């Protein structure tokens, strides 16, 4: 399986997506 990616707006792709990036895989703007 591939790591999950969390779609986020550039304004919201800060702490929530940083945590998701460490825990689940990645965050894409």
Curated annotation (Swiss-Prot):
SUPFAM superfamilies: Scorpion toxin-like. Its main location: secreted. It is found in: Secreted. Expressed by the venom gland. InterPro entries: Scorpion_toxin-like_sf. GO terms for cellular component: extracellular region. GO terms for molecular function: potassium channel regulator activity; toxin activity. Belongs to the short scorpion toxin superfamily. Potassium channel inhibitor family. Alpha-KTx 03 subfamily. Has the structural arrangement of an alpha-helix connected to antiparallel beta-sheets by disulfide bonds (CS-alpha/beta). Negative results: has no effect on rat Kv1.2/KCNA2, Kv1.4/KCNA4 and Kv1.5/KCNA5 channels. This is Potassium channel toxin alpha-KTx 3.15. The lineage of its organism: Eukaryota, Metazoa, Ecdysozoa, Arthropoda, Chelicerata.
